Amino acid sequence: MKEALSILCLALLVSVSEAEVTKPNSENFIECLRYRTSSENPITDSISIADNTTTFLSSYLSYTKNKRYSSPNFKKLLAIVAAKHVSHVQATVVCAKTNGIQLRIRSGGHDLEGLSYRSSVPFVILDMFNLRSITVNVLSKKAWVQAGATLGELYVKINEASQTLAFPAGVCPTVGVGGHISGGGYGNLMRKFGITVDHVSDAQLIDVNGKLLNRASMGEDLFWAIRGGGGASFGVILSWKINLVKVPKILTVFKVNKTLEQGGTDVLYKWQLVATKFPEDLFMRAWPQIINGAERGDRTIAVVFYAQFLGPADKLLAIMNQRLPELGLRREDCHEMSWFNTTLFWADYPAGTPKSVLLDRPTNPGFFKSKSDYVKKPIPKEGLEKLWKTMFKFNNIVWMQFNPYGGVMDQIPSTATAFPHRKGNMFKVQYSTTWLAANATEISLSMMKELYKVAEPYVSSNPREAFFNYRDIDIGSNPSDETNVDEAKIYGYKYFLGNLKRLMQVKAKYDPENFFKNEQSIPPVRVIE
């Protein structure tokens, strides 16, 4: 395709006010739901009308993870539909569209900016948590998992079927499968096997017309888009068919801390030089965080090194002694265990914790903010020290995670799926802060922006890349009721790089009126050569 492209926008500014739809009416919406569902699968009990009652607030808060958005906007939120059947999802899509009501789709509630459960225009929430069935086929090494299941539930089901099968996904067990996979979720198996979207072979999706589609009926372009491009811009993900991977019976993990006083900065600098060049069986995360110092009232930074190796401890020790002796890894630091038990380790549960804990769905929201970056070359020691200096300014919990690339991630083309961040990245950074009281929100958000600014010289640029699953409204957004294409390109190129153009084309083909939208959704644009 030539560099000079003429871009025909289906709508340079697509807004609710411009669409020829009826004025939002909750009563009409509810009646539509009842009309479009059968008595065999009644929807009435799945509907919670928005009101200031304990019952409704409990429904809203049960999957609201960020307390910054724990107070629903009753002037805009009309209802929550906790779908229990596919027909409930279909009816919700059709009835919301017919009545001019915006739809927000919530799986596990871990959307970091709360875009799956808030809007500034009249909307309904489609909760997916009841749709959580999982079927594992050991012979084919495949599984079907519904969007409302959590990673913890998926890992338990896999473990019940096999001791040597796994799925390369994240380490937080309460994350919902629907959004995690569609945004390109990653975990400690990524250097060996890639990320979630590299292991999806089929999907079920409800489109803008309420039709149930699979890979064959949706077509390869839409199937490509929902693997890494975020499913909520294109439809409602019902389920994923995933390919499981073979892992050894014995894996080894360790957790070693190095404070600044123990040479943590030097070890982290060396980590940057070797982490992407380790054998692909080894994943080693670096996690700088503020901790209490040796003296009362003192604070320091500890770089916590978490690692997982697909093999026994002796082989891991040999690698570490050769590649990163500065860490000083000892045999007693290493713990051999099954893949399933590593999921408990990474979730920070103590040894011996029953696996049933991964089935829990705790409702303990907190105040937090996260941002992300991709790093292409080592951050110099003076750069690390500037980051430490900024972290010390925080009065609340703050940390960064450095997640190494390399291995298989260097071998998968950036266009294989909609997830583009592949070869050329040394590691991905997540910045996070949490706080206890609402009155600390403003200063906490301001400090995160300062930390992000300090990191700017040391990370990717033009664009400054970002990870879609670490949603960050600061990098660009649209109002709830419109999608300005120029604004969408700002955040879109950061999340999707060169894949954005194809994503916009797919959006224009399957959702030309832009029904499935939020503040950071894909706009419908046809690109004509």
Curated annotation (Swiss-Prot):
Cofactor(s) listed in the protein's UniProt record: FAD
Domain of life: Eukaryota
One cellular component term from this protein's GO annotations in UniProt: plant-type cell wall
A single MF term (Gene Ontology): FAD binding
Post-translational modification as stated in the protein's UniProt record: The FAD cofactor is bound via a bicovalent 6-S-cysteinyl, 8alpha-N1-histidyl FAD linkage.
Disulfide bridge map: C32-C95
Cross-link entry 6-(S-cysteinyl)-8alpha-(pros-histidyl)-FAD (His-Cys), positions: H110-C172
Family: Belongs to the oxygen-dependent FAD-linked oxidoreductase family.
Protein name per UniProt: Berberine bridge enzyme-like 7
Organism: Arabidopsis thaliana
